[in-house]
Structures are given as structure tokens and as C-alpha cells.
Amino acid sequence: MAKTKSRGRRVEKSADKLEKKAQSLFEDTKSTGEEGGDDSNEIDASLKSPFFGLVDSNELDYFKQAESTLNVNAFDSDEDREGFIRSVLEEARGKELKLVTNQICSKLMERLILFASDRQLKNIFGQFSGHFVALAHHKYSSHVLETLLVRSAALIEKELIHDDSSQNEEEREEQEEGEVTDPMEGLFIKMVDEFKPHLQGMLEHQYSSHVLRLLILILAGKELPSTTTSNSTLRSKKSKIARKMIEIKDNQDFNKSFQTPSSFKIQLRELCNSVSNNQNSKRMRELAIHKIASPVLQLLIQVEGLVDRDRTFWHLIFLKDSEDKNSQEEAFVEYLLSDSVGSHFLEATIKNDGARIKYIERLYKLYMEDRILKLAKRSTTGVYIIQALLFKLKPVDVEHILDEIIPELSNLISISENQNLDLGQRLIDASISRGNYRRDEIIEQLFLKFAPNYNVQDPQLKTTSEFIENVLQLTGSTLGNTRDDWPTAEERRRSFFLEKLMEYDYKFVICVWYNFLALPVERFIQMCFHGVFSHIVERALVVIPSSEGEPKPVLILRKRVLNLFKDQIVNMSCNSYGSHIVDALWNFSVLLPMYKDRIGTELQGDSHKVKESTYGRLVWKNWSMELFVRKKYDWKSLIKQQEQAYYGVNDENGTTSRVKKPIELKMEKLAEERRLREEAAAKSESGYKRRHEDDNEDDYAKKQKLRGRRR
């Protein structure tokens, strides 16, 4: 057969173009950091799909069965489970590397690590020694390695706290059996030394970058977040979903920070130096907008202050705080403000405590202060930077941002396109933290956007349901669907937004009541049984505090709302969502004993159905229905106690103190947090000035100070 002729001219031209483009793009990086580039190429060549052998078919069946047994966890006692784990580890001895690189067996190894004892954990760690870099770059073993690192961090803290002398006898036994007896701290440092030559290559690797993030968190003594629930700094959204599907749950070592030895600070400093070595601004800015390397760089900026006063990573990306506007930096910041990865990087560096406030203020003053409104209109990028700045800048700058955005708030928010709902909530929080700054204007803008025909000062019963229709988008939602559709993420976001508005000001609660009355009763009852919209009904059932005094029209309106639940109490009590609403009606019907009695009568009328339901029994208990049925006088005494609590609780002096509203409690909490931040900042600043003065003193002044002359 004749050889196939490869296409020549077009391929050569395209290859030449790509080569020239790459050369021009990375010319600066190569000229300043040639050694680092060569090292990363060596890493890629040496870590091509590490292969430690195949698992035998018979072994695979055994380990697969063991994995399912551990997943079910149907052991009679912890001793039975420990014996089972011991036998599986005995069978897996010498095959650990094959198992962790196998898709099915890697899940088994992860479960074994989660349940392993301290001795077993050290033995597994010892088996991986010398292969950590290869395992970190593998699709399956990298997850096993992350779990091993978390358990190792917990064991290091345990060894630090407990006295080693009590373990000498046990260690001798281990040594006789040929097991690993070194302290976990030493084993961990050896592993870090394995990673050091390859750190720059790990930054951009799909799997090893996650291991590197976890390594940084452990060395810095930071909290190790969950891998399945919260917005984890360890895993991507896709990875968290996958872990939920394979049903691997975290143990008690996650969502915690661990005590670390002093040697870890040295290791963290060396790690940071290894990453930043031979790097220039161009290269670091490329990493900042790289979708894999960017989260690692965010973490390095967050922790570098622990070991580096010069903030090397920050100043490789941005200029020093004493320098003026720079055209290249301006172009880079503009890209961060308009790119999804870049905006997330800048938002994270602002939110985290790693970067100094003066660094953030410099970027704000030079590149963002004059175009707040323009950035707020970038609903997928720039607006998140603005939200982060609201809680980092000085009060004067925060008020400037509020002054720019509040007059245009109605134009910035778009419910139908799910744009800037978070901005509205953050503005409310910022307004509260500034002592309800421009509160009335915010309320006016929100009503202008969602209920332009609603008269806030003099609402009428003829009010339409436009407010909740515009906010929740009930038309076209899953409300009333008979196919058991799950509520969508958009419906949850809108629901949270409306709950925030009702918490912010009681005017929104009154408006929601009028909208409930304007809805068809069937539509309203459907909301009570909906997984998301039922929360709106529940949050709307709040009463004006007695200190403010409930006007008579509002009291009458409250009665009208209670009438909407007539003949629906039993069905709602037996529903997982509606039962919470019935519980809330106890407080909502305060000062209205007749309505309480009517609800109790409904529950008693079909008590058999209510008591058969799990949720119904809870409602029966919360409404004290046993007293209602058997001791009506005692039940009415509960109502009297509730009314007394509503008007205020008598203290020892005989005075009456009212219960504070949630917004007042939140303002007090924010004020306390602000006070603590200011105290910490002042303390840090005074310490820095004192050290700076000491450095600038001449030798004679230092001697005089030591002698006690300058007290």
C-alpha cells in the first residue's frame, strides 16, 4: 500500500502562524523565567498517565463488593466495621497504587481512608511515598489523595496535643511488625518536598491543582471546607455533584481548621517562593485569568501575608500602592472587570482577608470610582466587584457607591432575565450597615420597579397581584403543576429576594398581603403547598411589634389574610410545606383569639387524619391541641401568656422591655463586627508603626531605649 501523503502547505502555514503567535505571547515570560518554563515541560513529560498495573478481575469483584459493603455501612457495631476494614486493608497491601488509579477501587480506598485508624492511615501514607506527584495528577487518585491529606491534618493536630511518651510502647509494637512509625508531621513534610519541584506545573493541571489548594490550606492552618455541600475552595461545582452521586460523605475532619506545627510556616514560605520563583507580571496575570490556576492564585494571595510581608504575589499582579495609574495595569483591570474568570478572581481577592485594604482602595480609586454605574450594568462580571467593594471600603466610599446606584436601581434589576437580584440584596445590607442610609429611596425604587401602580401611603383592597407576579414570575412557574416538577433555581433566587424585601421593611409585607387577597384562593393555596413559594407565605406571616403599634386597618387586613386559610388547615397540617405555615399562624393570630379558636376547632374536627401524619403530629404538638381538647382553660392561658409576651416582658424592676425586631438585631451585629474590625485594624497599624520606628532608630536611640530612658 502506498504511503498517504500528508498535506503540506496549509498545515505548514497554520503551524507557522500558531508558533509565531505563541512565541510573541510568551516572549516576555521566556526571557525572564526560562528555567521555570523548562521545569514545567519536564513535569508534563514525566507525568503522562501514571500506570501501576491492572487490577485482576477476581480482585476487582472482591474490592467492588467491599466498597458496596462500606457504602451501606450495615455493621452491627464499630468493632465489626473495624475488623472488616482491617481484612480489606490486609488484602490490599502492596496493591494500593493500583487500586487508587482504578475508577471503582479508588472509591473503596477513599472510604477506607475515611474509616481508617491512625496506624492504618500512616501505613497508607507510607505506601504512597515517592508517588505523590504522579497520584496528584491522576483523575481518580487525586480525590483519594485529598481525603488522605485531610485525615493527615487531623492526625498531625492529634499528635501535637497528646504526649508522645504514652505511645512509645505502641510504636515499638508497630516497629516490630514493620509498620510506619514516623511522626505524621515528618511524613507530611517529606510529601511537600516531593511536590516542590513541580508546583508551577501543578498550578494549571486539571487534577493536581485541587491537591495544591488543599496543601496550601493545611500548611496555613485554614479551615478545610466540605467537598460536597458549601461553595468549596477544594472542588468545582461539577466535582461536588459527582461526589454526591457516588455517596461519599465527609467525616468530622472536614469543615474544620487544625492546629499546625511551626515547621509548616517554613514549608508554606518555601512553597510560595517555589511558585513565585522566576515569574514575571505577564505570566502571573495570565494565571490570574486562567480558569484552573486562578483559584489557586486566589488562595496564595489570601495566605501569603502569613509568611511574606512584601506580598510578592499581589505585587507581581498589581503595582505597589504608592504608584499611579499605569496603562498596562489599567488594561488588565479592565479585562478582570469584564471577564467571568477574571471578575471572580478580583471579587475573591477583595472578599478574602489576604490583600491589604490600601491595595484594594488604590485599585478602586484609580480604575473604578468614576464608573460605578457602568460596572453595575455588567450583570455577569463587574456588578459582583461592586458588591464586594460595598463591604470592604471606607464609609465615605461606600456611600459614594450607594449614591451612584440607588437612583438607578429600578433600571438595573431585571427579574425576567435574572439580573442583579444579588445587587439589590447587597445594597440593602450596605444601607443597613450605614445606619439605613437612603432607606426611603431604596424602598421607593423597588416599588417603582415591581409595583408601579401600588399606592404605598394609602393601599386599597382593589390592589392587583402585580407585586408578587413581577417578583416571583408566578405565570410560567412550576406553581400548580401536576407533574411534580421540582422548583427551579431561578424560583429560589426570586423567593430569597422577596424574603429579603419583607425583612427589610414592613411596607413590603403589607403589599404582599394585599397581593395574596388579590390572587384567586386556589392560586394562593397552591403557593402554600409549593416547595419554594410556601416560604414566601410563611415569611409574610409577621405582626408589627407592639412598640410601634398596629394600626386598625392593618389589624383588619390581618384578619382578611387569616380568612384565606379557612377550611384548609387540616390539609396544610399534613403537608411538609404547609405544616410550617400552620405553625406560623400561632404567632400571626396574636390578639385574635377567635381566629385561634377557629383553627383549633378545624384541627380537632379531623384529629384522626392530623395525628396519622408525621407533619400533622408536629402541628398538633406546636398548637398544644391536647390542652385544647382536654383543658381548654389552660389553652386559653397560653394565649394570654402570648399576648403578654407580645406587649413586653416584665423584668425585675417592673419595667417593660420590648422584643427587638430582626433588622435591629442585625444592625447591632453589624455595628459590633465593624467595631471589632476597626480595633483590629488600629492594633495592626500601631504595631506596624512601632516596628517601623524601631527600624528607623539609630543605634544610640536604641541603646537609650533599652536603658529605660524613653519610657
Swiss-Prot record:
UniProt biased composition (Basic and acidic residues): 9-33, 676-702
One BP term from GO: endonucleolytic cleavage to generate mature 5'-end of SSU-rRNA from (SSU-rRNA, 5.8S rRNA, LSU-rRNA)
UniProt Pumilio repeat ranges: 91-126, 127-162, 194-230, 279-314, 328-365, 519-556, 563-601
Superkingdom of this protein's organism: Eukaryota
InterPro entries to which the protein is assigned, alphabetical: ARM-like, ARM-type_fold, NOP9, Pumilio_RNA-bd_rpt
Gene3D superfamilies in alphabetical order: Leucine-rich Repeat Variant
UniProt-listed SUPFAM superfamilies: ARM repeat
PROSITE patterns: PUM
Location within or outside the cell: Nucleus, Nucleolus
UniProt-annotated stretches for the region Disordered: 1-43, 161-180, 676-711
Keyword rRNA processing in annotation: yes
Name used for this protein in its record: Nucleolar protein 9
Organism: Scheffersomyces stipitis (strain ATCC 58785 / CBS 6054 / NBRC 10063 / NRRL Y-11545) (Yeast)
